[in-house]
């Protein structure tokens, strides 16, 4: 039988005192740890559970009671530093719409932290060998498929971590003999944790230091230097002036 996921998405983050904005979608168990890791952050939470606000959660959380799979999130584009949600796309009718939609609410330096159940895990394959499939209402993914989905949803950098559950003796050997590749213990990885960034790491620092308008001005100045615009303009003016003399 499938096991429940152990919440480990926060391993992608380092505690700090920055005034971040962090949105948690359904995975409310992260809220207490987030408050400890980021004491100055504004925490937001989205859930379809009407009783969620009565749960043991940190004070000051900004709530939205809605089903994110069917109702658009009511936030400003480019608002959040992080969006955190386990198994976000497992029940989505159109997962790319959800993933791309979430990316719009992230700052250019922001990241989407999520996870997915690996369809190549030995437990899924073993059930299929026995004539069963228990994920009729869920979407399971391979690592490559999930990464491609995120790249197609406007994320520029993908990092993953594994949550493993070992196979019974000799099962992996049987699967490999049958033709299943097992690169990086994929067949024993039940869940993948994913950090999807809106920007490449080498650009994220630059974007955090300068506004969009400032970066556009820098690009124009660099282009003028690169193509020696001032010199070319001066030579053109001299040529035009010479023709009229």
What are these regions (language model features)?
Residues 1-74, 78, 189-192, 202-245:
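Conserved N-terminal segment of class I S-adenosyl-L-methionine
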Residues 35, 103-104:
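Surface-exposed amphipathic alpha-helices with a cationic face
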Residues 56, 106-107:
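Compositionally biased, low-complexity repeat tracts
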Residues 84:
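A conserved beta-strand element that flanks and buttresses the S-adenosyl-L-methionine
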Residues 87-91:
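A short His-aromatic
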Residues 93-97, 101, 107-234:
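S-adenosyl-L-methionine-dependent methyltransferase catalytic module, highlighting the catalytic core
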């Amino acid at each position: 039988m499938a096991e429940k996921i152990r919440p480990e998405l926060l391993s992608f983050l380092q505690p700090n005192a920055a005034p971040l904005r962090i949105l948690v979608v359904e995975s409310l168990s992260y809220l207490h740890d987030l408050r400890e890791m980021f004491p100055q952050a504004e925490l937001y939470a989205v859930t379809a559970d009407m009783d969620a606000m009565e749960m043991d959660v940190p004070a000051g959380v900004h709530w939205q009671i809605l089903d994110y799979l069917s109702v658009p999130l009511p936030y400003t584009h480019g608002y959040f530093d992080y969006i955190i949600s386990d198994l976000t796309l497992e029940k989505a009718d159109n997962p790319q719409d959800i993933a791309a939609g979430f990316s719009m609410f992230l700052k250019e330096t922001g990241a989407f932290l999520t996870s997915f159940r690996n369809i190549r895990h030995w437990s899924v394959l073993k059930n299929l060998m026995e004539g069963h499939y228990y994920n009729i209402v869920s979407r399971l993914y391979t690592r490559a498929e999930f990464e491609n989905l995120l790249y197609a949803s406007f994320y520029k950098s993908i990092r993953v971590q594994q949550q493993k559950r070992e196979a019974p003796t000799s099962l992996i050997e049987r699967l490999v003999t049958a033709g299943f590749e097992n690169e990086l213990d994929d067949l024993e990885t039940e869940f993948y944790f994913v950090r999807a960034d809106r920007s490449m790491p080498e650009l994220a620092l630059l974007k955090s230091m300068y506004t969009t308008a400032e970066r556009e001005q820098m690009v124009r100045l660099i282009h003028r230097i690169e193509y020696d615009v001032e010199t070319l303009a001066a030579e053109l003016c001299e040529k035009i002036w010479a023709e009229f003399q």
